[in-house]
Curated annotation (Swiss-Prot):
This is Eukaryotic translation initiation factor 2D. Residues 478-551 form the SUI1 domain. Residues 370-454 form the SWIB/MDM2 domain. Keywords: Acetylation, Cytoplasm, Initiation factor, Phosphoprotein, Protein biosynthesis. The modification Phosphoserine is found at residues 238, 241, 348. The keyword Transmembrane does not apply. One of its GO terms (molecular function) is RNA binding. It comes from the Eukaryota. It is found in: Cytoplasm. One of its GO terms (cellular component) is cytoplasm. Its main location: cytoplasm.
């Protein structure tokens, strides 16, 4: 809502009666706030202003400011807290967690899609469709966005975490935030921090599976008893043997099954080096049989790193710490008897349907054509052929129109048919002022070259299965530059990916995995609604492989590949 600049209608100090009414409205809208907290938010004597404004789409919004910062905004008689308020009261709204890379999309006006939601150990917050929600980033409880739930928690889980999760209204770094002191989110530690990133990935994904399991029980009429989980007897029962085998032994078998299944059917050589957390989160959990839950903490290994050490001792995989504290699988022996003898279980019909529906379509490069746009000063030349100012034409069409015009007006020289006589219209369209009375005839190739040069550039981009997109101006290639930072550190910067249908966040995630380097997605300087990807180090060689070999983009649409490190150099 505030991704673009808004128009202020009025800004006045609040009246005493309106202040009391606002305090009462806040108490009703946010019942979790105590009396003291409401008084702190809506002080009795400090300056409090009411700002009436129109958002860029025309919505009438009332904003309440205190101490120069917007604290609340009202839309269609509903009150919403701003991020400034949520930083003081981080638990005011149920919060959904997402990755830092997603923030750029939210700031640009996008809604939060469910595939970008990180499920915490406790599962997703319980909300109904239309409930107010906050959005926070992994590792920090300070909210960075406010929105409305697009569906209930039950619907989110039933959808397999696909589709729109939250309709975003306001974010950190948007224009409403900019109207305040522009402070950054405070660092607020998670309520239940874990010891390592590995455990976070394990617990987060396990929490998602646990939530899905509980939702299934509710749908079957079996409502779980929350008190039962706290009963010592029930905890003891959970450790008893099942089907004659201890639970720990069963979890060890399930862990190995998911591991071998992932290596045999999901992980490819091109994926290496592969972060161990990615192996667990993106491959092993999805290989878990329907109706079962993979929980490493219930296995004898307790941690993924210990399990992978065991698999390395069996010479199935090779694990290395490519960067400090981050382990990756760098090699897999796909000829190992444990992998070759493993039989991939047949998926159920339901899981097959889900997988087919959720499978991402491979990237296909667009078909790109250079076009020419008719400017105002050349309109007369193209009117007879039915074209007007702003019409776009291919080069072959321009040649045909010029040829027809010359023949129709008897401009071809009778003595030398390679020459074309210039009439007043052609003179005005293609000659310079100092040539007007000097040049009377031109060869065909010179005439056509001059005509194409004076037309305005345009281009057409057609993605497979979509309608063509025509844009005026020159086509900007994917621009790769190498920037030298302090202490001689290099950063690879990529721009203009969106023109070719590439998502900067997706490209950044791929480069982060393959280069084992940190990546940042940020607004491109001087470019409206465009993002750039920064990768630590000289990663132009990896970029070239991705863009040319995998995405199959023609090299003429990529500039900067010559800056790739030479063989034998870093």
């Amino acid at each position: 809502m505030f991704a673009k600049a808004f128009r202020v209608k009025s800004n006045t100090a609040i009246k005493g009666s309106d202040r009391r009414k606002l305090r009462a409205d806040v108490t009703v809208a946010f019942p979790t706030l105590g009396t003291d907290q409401v008084s702190e938010l809506i002080p009795g004597k400090e300056e409090l202003n009411v700002v009436k404004l129109y958002a860029h789409k025309g919505d009438a919004v009332t904003v309440y400011t205190s101490g120069g910062n917007p604290i609340l905004f009202e839309l269609e008689k509903n009150l919403y807290p701003t991020v400034y308020t949520l930083w003081s009261h981080p638990d005011l709204l149920p919060a959904f967690i997402t990755w830092p890379l997603v923030l750029e999309k939210l700031v640009g006006g996008a809604d939060l899609m469910l595939p970008g939601v990180v499920v915490p150990p406790t599962g997703l917050p319980q909300v109904q469709q239309g409930d107010l929600c906050a959005i926070a980033l992994v590792g920090n409880r300070a909210p960075v966005a406010v929105g409305v739930a697009a569906m209930s928690t039950a619907q989110m889980l039933a959808s397999g975490l696909k589709g729109k999760g939250i309709s975003v209204l306001h974010t950190y770094q948007d224009h409403l935030w900019r109207s305040g002191d522009k402070s950054s989110p405070p660092a607020i530690a998670p309520l239940d921090p874990t010891d390592s990133c590995e455990e976070k990935a394990d617990l987060g994904l396990h929490g998602n599976l646990r939530s899905l399991s509980l939702e299934g029980e509710e749908e079957n009429g079996q409502v779980p008893n929350p008190e039962a989980s706290d009963d010592p007897n029930s905890r003891a029962l959970s450790q008893d043997s099942v089907d004659g085998k201890p639970l720990q032994e069963q979890m060890d078998e399930l862990l190995e099954q998911c591991f071998l299944h992932a290596l045999k059917s999901r992980v490819k050589k091109a994926d290496l080096p592969l972060l161990t957390s990615t192996l667990l989160g993106s491959h092993m959990f999805s290989c878990c049989p329907e109706g079962q839950q993979l929980d490493i903490k219930k296995s004898s290994y307790k941690k993924l790193s210990k399990f992978l050490q065991h698999m390395q001792q069996e010479q199935i995989v090779q694990v290395k710490e490519l960067s400090k504290g981050v382990e990756s699988i760098v090699a897999v022996d796909w000829r190992h008897p444990r992998i070759t003898s493993f039989i991939v279980p047949e998926p159920s019909l339901a899981s097959q349907t889900v997988q087919e529906g959720s499978r991402e379509k491979p990237y296909l490069p667009p078909d790109i054509k250079s076009l020419y746009c008719v400017p105002a000063n050349m309109t007369q030349l193209f009117l007879e052929s039915g074209h007007k100012k702003g019409s776009t034409l291919e080069g072959s069409e321009v040649r045909r129109i010029i040829t027809d015009y010359a023949k129709r007006n008897n401009l071809v020289d009778a003595d030398n048919r390679n020459l074309v006589k210039l009439d007043p219209i052609l003179c005005d369209c293609i000659l310079e002022k100092n040539e007007q009375h000097l040049v009377m005839k031109l060869p065909w190739d010179s005439l056509l070259t001059r005509c194409l040069k004076n037309l305005q550039p345009a281009y057409q981009v057609t993605f497979p299965g979509q309608e063509p997109i025509i844009k005026k101006g020159k086509l900007c290639p994917i621009d790769i530059t190498l920037v030298l930072k302090t202490y001689n550190k290099k950063v690879t910067v990529v721009r203009n990916l969106e023109t070719y249908g590439l998502d900067p966040c997706s490209v950044a995630a791929i480069l982060q995995q393959r280069c084992q380097a940190s990546t940042i997605v940020s607004p491109a300087p001087g470019a409206k609604d465009s993002l750039q990807v920064q990768v630590q180090g000289n990663q132009i060689h990896h970029l070239g492989q991705l863009l040319l070999e995998e995405y199959r983009l023609p090299g003429k649409y990529i500039q900067g590949l010559e800056k790739a490190p030479k063989p034998g150099k870093k």
